[in-house]
Amino acid sequence: MTRYDSLLQALGNTPLVGLQRLSPRWDDGRDGPHVRLWAKLEDRNPTGSIKDRPAVRMIEQAEADGLLRPGATILEPTSGNTGISLAMAARLKGYRLICVMPENTSVERRQLLELYGAQIIFSAAEGGSNTAVATAKELAATNPSWVMLYQYGNPANTDSHYCGTGPELLADLPEITHFVAGLGTTGTLMGTGRFLREHVANVKIVAAEPRYGEGVYALRNMDEGFVPELYDPEILTARYSVGAVDAVRRTRELVHTEGIFAGISTGAVLHAALGVGAGALAAGERADIALVVADAGWKYLSTGAYAGSLDDAETALEGQLWA
C-alpha cells in the first residue's frame, strides 16, 4: 500500500481491469486474434470520479498563476462530478466554492456538494450544462473577484490527462490499439488521446457521444450548439453516437456480467467500445481496447436508472439525463 500526506495526493494510478466476459474474443485462437476490452476504473479516485484529476490540476495551476489566494471564491459550471471534486479540494485548501448546475441533477450530487460546503446556484433544466455554462459566465462578469476555473476551456483539464491518464494507460497496456471515452468537457479524450497518439503508432481514439437530440448524463453531442474550447476534432479517429436507452442497458450489462457498478455515461462508452470491438472481430484484427469508467453508479440511484425494466428506467430518466 502507498502512504500519502494528503488526500489530494491520492488521485490517479487507477486499476485497469480486463473485461473477459464482455470482450468479443479474449484469447487468441484458430478463429482469429484476440479482441479484448479493458476498463480503467476512475471511480477509484478520492471522490469517486475521473474529475478529481482535472479539478485538482486546475486549482493548483490557478494557485501557481497567482489567480487563487487564501480565502478566494471559485465559481464553476458543472453537472455534478467536477463540482464534487472541486468541493473536496476547495474544502481542504480553504476556498469558497460556488457551483452552477442544472436544476434536474440527482439529489445525491446536490447532497454531496452541500456536505462539502459548496454553494449551489441552479440553472434551468432546459439546455442542461450548456445553460449552466451561460449562467456561470454571467455571474463571473458581474463578480470579477470570483475565479472561474472553467473546465471546458482550461488547458489544465487536458494536461491532467496528458500527464496522468495517458501515461498510466501506456504503462499498464503498452499493446493498446484503441482508447474510448465520453465526450463531455472533452478533456479526457483530448489529453489522453494526444499523449497516446504521440507514443503509440496507429492508435485509434474514439469518442462516445449522445445521439443527436438525446441526453446522456455528463456527455454532449458536438452538433448541438456549445462546443468546448478544449475540443480538437483532429485528435479523434471516430465519434460513436449512443442512445440514452442503450447507455442504461449497457450500464446494467456491465454490472451483471463483470460486476462493475458504473455511472450512466460509462454505459455509453461501453456501447461504443463494443461496437469498435465488433468491427475489429469482423476484420480479423487484434484489438486491445481501453475504455474509461468515469464514475460509479452510487450518485444516480435516485434517478431510477437501475431499477425495474428498461422501459421503467427510460420513463424515470426522462428530463434527468443532461450533458
Swiss-Prot record:
Q: What keywords were assigned to this record?
A: Amino-acid biosynthesis, Cysteine biosynthesis, Pyridoxal phosphate, Transferase
Q: Which GO terms describe its molecular function?
A: cysteine synthase activity; O-phosphoserine sulfhydrylase activity; pyridoxal phosphate binding
Instruction: Determine the domain of life of the protein's source.
Output: Bacteria
Q: Which InterPro entries match?
A: Cys_synth, Cys_Synth/Cystath_Beta-Synth, P-phosphate_BS, TrpB-like_PALP, TrpB-like_PALP_sf
* Binding locations of pyridoxal 5'-phosphate: 81, 184-188, 265
State the GO CC annotations.
cytoplasm; cytosol; protein-containing complex
E.C. numbers: 2.5.1.113
Stimuli inducing this protein? Up-regulated under oxidative stress conditions.
Phenotype on deletion? Strains lacking this gene are shown to be attenuated in macrophages.
Report which residue ranges the record marks as coiled coil: none
What this protein is reported to do is described as: Catalyzes the formation of a covalent CysO-cysteine adduct via a sulfur transfer, using the thiocarboxylated sulfur carrier protein CysO-COSH as sulfur donor and O-phospho-L-serine (OPS) as sulfur acceptor. Can also use sodium sulfide as sulfur donor in vitro, albeit with less efficiency, but not thiosulfate or thio-nitro-benzoate. O-acetylserine (OAS) is a very poor substrate in comparison with OPS. May be of particular importance for cysteine biosynthesis in the persistent phase of M.tuberculosis.
Q: How does it assemble?
A: Homodimer.
In which family does this protein belong, per the annotation?
A: Belongs to the cysteine synthase/cystathionine beta-synthase family.
This protein is called O-phosphoserine sulfhydrylase
